[in-house]
Amino acid sequence: MYVASESDDTVSLLKFENNEITEVERITVGTYPTEIEGPHGITVDPNGKFWYLSLAHGNPFGKLVKYSTESNEVVDETTLGLFPASMQVSTTTGFLYCVNFNLHGSMKPSTVSVVDPVTMTEITTITTGSMPHGSRISPDGLYQYSVAMMSGELFEVDALGLEVSRTLDLESKMMKKDGMKSMDGMKSMDGMKSMDGMKS
């Protein structure tokens, strides 16, 4: 397991065995020795050959850095948006989706960067909400989800169409009697059929 230390510009490779955790290696990251560049999000690609790290504290933009899991050495890097944060790789599209958290910027809609991890090229950016975080890919690899912290919305991105497909207003939701959250605020962006109270 790779764990980032945002205030220390290091990544620890941890090994779990029985009831013990061992730090196998501590990897120094970043390119400016006198500045904290803020390693934030980490993900390993589906084939296990590479791991990716977002360096959030850019000037002004952050970076996505690609490492080899065999050597833990830098393979390539690319510039993303303001404070790139959490990310995952879709097993269906092969693309990496990284939210640009924009922690220090103005409270306006930010973006999800879509990156080809083979060439380390940012293909496009998709506008979502203010301060998006918590990027997750659906099990089938067809959708990317993130929550905009300041606008209180869940965004669903079509991983193939590269556009927002639905949004859910989280601030207006109430718990049902059975403890399950209502999904009646989920709005389709493309007219797709509504499901269990999701609005088109």
What name fits each language-model region?
Residues 1-200:
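Predominantly soluble domains enriched in secretory-pathway, periplasmic, or organellar proteins
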